[in-house]
A protein has these predicted regions:
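N-terminal secretory signal peptides that target proteins for export/translocation
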Residues: 1-2
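Bacterial N-terminal signal peptides
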Residues: 5-16
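Exported/periplasmic ABC-transporter solute-binding proteins
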Residues: 20-70, 79-80, 84-89, 93-103, ...
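Short active-site segment of divalent metal-dependent hydrolases/proteases
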Residues: 76
C-alpha cells in the first residue's frame, strides 16, 4: 500500500529560561496532535509545576493568529508552507526550526458501516457518494485538506468527489462528522484514529510526492 507521509515543522519563539519558569508557555499545535500534545503537557505540568498550555487548530488558522500577535512560544505546523509564512514575518528564533515527525492520511468510516467503497473504482465511488458526502478538512487552506485533495487528484477521482465534500475547519472536526454518523466517510490523519473504537480504517491514501 502506498503511503502518504506529511512532515511537521517546529519553531521556537523567544522565551528565556527564567521567563519559562515564571510565565505560561503556549504551544500552538496542529489539531491532529491534540491527543499527543495534551497528554505530554499534562504530564509535564504535573511533574514540574509549570504551566504549559496547548492551543489546537488548523495550521493555517494558528499561523495567522501568531502573525497577528498571539502569544505562542512553540508552533507545530502540519506543513512547511504555513511555517514559512510565520518565518517571513521574522517570528521564529534562528536555527530553531526542524522537521519533527510525519503522518499519514487514511479513509475512515463508522465501525458499524457495511458500505463497501473503493478509491480505485470510480463507478463504485460515484454510486456510494450519491446523496452522501465525504468529510475532509477545508482543502483551500488546511494542510490535511490540501493533502487529501492532492491524494484524490493522484487517484484521478477528485472530479467525482469535489461536489460531495463536507468541509471542516480542521481535521479533528472532519473526524467528528464521521464519529457522529453525519457522513459515511472521511479522510483524516492516521494519528487521529489512534484509540478510537467507533471508527475503522478503510484504506490509506497514496503518496503525495509534491506536498510541502
Amino acid at each position: 500500500m502506498l503511503r502518504a507521509l506529511y512532515t511537521l515543522a517546529i519553531a521556537l519563539f523567544v522565551l528565556s529560561p527564567a521567563a519559562f519558569a515564571k510565565t505560561k508557555t503556549y504551544i500552538y499545535a496542529a489539531s491532529s496532535l491534540t491527543g499527543t500534545i495534551t497528554k505530554a503537557a499534562r504530564d509535564f505540568n504535573a511533574k514540574t509545576g509549570l504551566s504549559v498550555i496547548p492551543v489546537f487548530g488548523a495550521s493555517s488558522t494558528l499561523a495567522r493568529q501568531i502573525i497577528q500577535g498571539a502569544p505562542a512560544n512553540l508552533f507545530i505546523s502540519a506543513n512547511k508552507l504555513w511555517m514559512d509564512k510565520v518565518s517571513q514575518h521574522q517570528l521564529i528564533v534562528s536555527g530553531s526550526r526542524l522537521d519533527l515527525t510525519a503522518n499519514q492520511l487514511i479513509l475512515i468510516a463508522p465501525k458499524s458501516s457495511n458500505i463497501a467503497v473503493s478509491l480505485s473504482d470510480t463507478k463504485n465511488l460515484t454510486s456510494v457518494l450519491s446523496g452522501n458526502r465525504i468529510a475532509i478538512a477545508d482543502p483551500n487552506h488546511v494542510p490535511a485538506g490540501l493533502y487529501a485533495k492532492k491524494a484524490l487528484q493522484t487517484l484521478k477521482i477528485w472530479p467525482h468527489i469535489k461536489n460531495h465534500l463536507a468541509m471542516a475547519a480542521n481535521v479533528r472536526i472532519a473526524l467528528s462528522y464521521v464519529e457522529r454518523g453525519e457522513v459515511p466517510f472521511g479522510i483524516v490523519y492516521k494519528s487521529d484514529n489512534v484509540g478510537r473504537t467507533n471508527i475503522k480504517t478503510i484504506t490509506h491514501a497514496p503518496a503525495c510526492r509534491s506536498c510541502p
